[in-house]
């Protein structure tokens, strides 16, 4: 599935497929499904909860950015040469506009695995 998602004030074409979880593991060394389960817990928090628990969310930042990086490069190969270049291009991860984007990123990442409502 391919979708355009706004992150850090910029629109990116992102793609999720059966390959996404393998690309994620190869790039990060972490389990795609384990990290997705952490993000689905985040999705249920309201924006006030997130603001109050930013310190607790710190590990989640990398998961969101890493998943975005993988799906952007899957949609349009070589959009970024490496994760560091991608990280530098993002001005803000969490703001009122990005909360919907984060939900979209999670839903897109899950789409090759499960197409129901989350």
Language model regions located:
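Short, amphipathic alpha-helical segments that act as regulatory/interfacial helices
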Residues: 65-73
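Charged interaction scaffolds used for protein-protein
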Residues: 1-11, 31-54, 62, 76-118
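Short capping micro-motif at the N-terminus of alpha-helices
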Residues: 14-16
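Short, surface-exposed, low-complexity cationic segments
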Residues: 18-37
């Amino acid at each position: 599935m391919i979708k355009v998602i706004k992150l850090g004030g910029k629109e990116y074409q992102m793609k999720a497929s059966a390959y996404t979880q393998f690309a994620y593991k190869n790039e990060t060394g972490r389990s795609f499904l384990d990290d997705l389960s952490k993000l689905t817990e985040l999705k249920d928090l309201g924006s006030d909860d997130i603001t109050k628990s930013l310190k607790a969310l710190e590990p989640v930042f990398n998961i969101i950015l890493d998943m975005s990086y993988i799906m952007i490069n899957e949609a349009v190969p070589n959009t970024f040469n490496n994760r560091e270049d991608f990280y530098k291009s993002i001005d803000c991860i969490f703001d009122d506009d990005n909360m919907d984007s984060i939900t979209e990123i999670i839903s897109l990442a899950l789409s090759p695995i499960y197409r129901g409502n989350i």
